[in-house]
């Protein structure tokens, strides 16, 4: 990837758009260094989160990934109970106090707009939930770690329109507390929920601006071609 230079505003929603293979997800996973897990990946440049370069030698990777949560394209609840899914990360950090776990579990499910639907079945298997519920559970699991940033890689691509709407409404609500960066192939979704949009093509950030400006007055011809359906 190249020509990547942007400032993501705190407590905003930023979407990355562009054709498949243009580098959207690669960049997204760079923000919490998930790309480190891929053999042969090389990185040059700087990514700063709150004025700290995440590639500095003294960076605590575990802490970084706690502060920068990730929600993947396909809902991926663990094959355990709903409750255990939400508190899984907390337990891995050594938190064992049941009152604390119960409180954070409820808070996270409330924020994920799922509490009312599952509060009476917390011990039930998470895999028994619908696809939309599973994705909101995964968001609750990420929220439970109290991140500052939420990364979302096409979080509604595997969901039906009704479930998609619920997740979009949730994301808009979460913006009050979190900075959200999302990859989407849906231009309509980008216009509905994002404050800022970056258009990527062949590994290059072609244009980055407020979403309204990207879709109504793009500066680059390549951006205009893509959003008008003339991309080849």
From Swiss-Prot:
The keyword Cell membrane applies. Transmembrane segments: none annotated. It catalyses: phosphate(out) + ATP + H2O = ADP + 2 phosphate(in) + H(+). One of its GO terms (biological process) is phosphate ion transmembrane transport. Belongs to the ABC transporter superfamily. Phosphate importer (TC 3.A.1.7) family. Part of the ABC transporter complex PstSACB involved in phosphate import. Responsible for energy coupling to the transport system. This is Phosphate import ATP-binding protein PstB. The lineage of its organism: Bacteria, Bacillati, Mycoplasmatota, Mollicutes, Mycoplasmataceae.
């Amino acid at each position: 990837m190249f020509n990547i230079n942007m400032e993501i505003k705190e407590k905003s929603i930023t979407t990355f758009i562009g054709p498949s293979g243009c580098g959207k997800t690669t960049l997204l996973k760079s923000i919490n260094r998930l790309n480190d897990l891929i053999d042969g990946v090389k990185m040059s440049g700087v990514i700063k989160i709150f004025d700290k370069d995440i590639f500095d030698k003294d960076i605590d990777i575990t802490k970084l990934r706690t502060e920068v949560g990730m929600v993947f394209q396909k809902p991926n609840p663990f094959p355990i109970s709903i409750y255990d899914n939400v508190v899984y990360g907390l337990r891995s950090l050594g938190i064992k106090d049941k009152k604390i776990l119960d409180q954070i579990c409820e808070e996270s499910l409330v924020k994920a707009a799922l509490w009312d639907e599952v509060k009476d079945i917390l011990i039930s298997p998470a895999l028994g939930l619908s696809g939309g519920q599973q994705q909101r559970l995964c968001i609750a699991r990420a929220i439970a770690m109290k991140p500052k940033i939420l990364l979302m890689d096409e979080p509604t691509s595997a969901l039906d329109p009704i479930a998609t709407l619920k997740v979009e409404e949730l994301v808009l609500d979460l913006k009050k507390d979190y900075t959200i960066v999302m990859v989407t192939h849906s231009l309509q979704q980008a216009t509905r929920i994002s404050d800022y949009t970056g258009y990527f093509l062949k590994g290059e950030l072609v244009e980055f601006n407020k979403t309204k400006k990207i879709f109504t007055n793009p500066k680059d011809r390549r951006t205009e071609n893509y959003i008008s359906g003339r991309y080849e």
